[in-house]
Amino acid sequence: MPVRILVVDDDRAVRESLRRSLSFNGYSVELAQDGREALDLIASDRPDAVVLDVMMPRLDGLEVCRQLRSTGDDLPILVLTARDSVSERVAGLDAGADDYLPKPFALEELLARMRALLRRTTPDDGAGESAAMTFSDLSLDPVTREVTRGDRPISLTRTEFSLLEMLIANPRRVLTRSRILEEVWGFDFPTSGNALEVYVGYLRRKTEAEGEPRLIHTVRGVGYVLRETPP
């Protein structure tokens, strides 16, 4: 059975363009023109993932995310944000979106991000044998998907979890931007912009929320490294 994607956007041209592209690439596509219609469709005929615009009438994309997450629903969500609105991107992640894509975007990038998001959603057959990974007082369990810093639990989206998992699996090893983008997002497009920087900043905010020392460091011009002290 094809993977079912719900596309939610109040712009008819955007909806139809995404429907054609996703259908051409083997997905089954449903359309909604606002957040209220989207929630009704999700309740009646649940899709496998959602592409969700932020700015919409009646009920915006952020509120859709919040309502789904407040009920414990972990439906994979990719939000579409205004190109230059960093606050909108952060708000999307705060609301519980798994990933974001600024408009205008290349269709190839949206398809790559959707593949990566669905891949992160699919359980790994060998995951049951994985042991929890630790670095300093940071712990990540690939099976239960629980993350803690000391005794403090940390809630992460799928993308944040995948990024932290890559870092903690390569302690004290500098990882290049291109390698991280390829492994976590499945691509390294020039249009990716500052997606990686946004997610690193978000992980830092969550792992340092109670004043803990920084573990995720920038290696200027190269990438990032997980270590106790700055490089």
From Swiss-Prot:
It holds the Pfam family Response_reg. One of its GO terms (biological process) is regulation of DNA-templated transcription. The modification 4-aspartylphosphate is found at D48. Residues 4-118 form the Response regulatory domain. Gene3D superfamilies: 3.40.50.2300, 6.10.250.690, Winged helix-like DNA-binding domain superfamily/Winged helix DNA-binding domain. Keywords: Cytoplasm, DNA-binding, Phosphoprotein, Stress response, Transcription, Transcription regulation, Two-component regulatory system, Virulence. Coiled coil: none annotated. Residues 130-228 bind DNA. It is found in: Cytoplasm. InterPro entries: CheY-like_superfamily, OmpR/PhoB-type_DNA-bd, Sig_transdc_resp-reg_receiver, WalR-like, WH-like_DNA-bd_sf. GO terms for cellular component: cytosol; protein-DNA complex. Phosphorylated and dephosphorylated by MprB. GO terms for molecular function: phosphorelay response regulator activity; transcription cis-regulatory region binding. Member of the two-component regulatory system MprB/MprA which contributes to maintaining a balance among several systems involved in stress resistance and is required for establishment and maintenance of persistent infection in the host. Functions as a transcriptional regulator that recognizes a 19-bp nucleotide motif comprizing two loosely conserved 8-bp direct DNA-binding motif repeats separated by a 3-bp spacer region. PANTHER family: REGULATOR OF RPOS (PTHR48111:SF22). This is Response regulator MprA. It comes from Mycolicibacterium vanbaalenii (strain DSM 7251 / JCM 13017 / BCRC 16820 / KCTC 9966 / NRRL B-24157 / PYR-1). The gene is mprA.
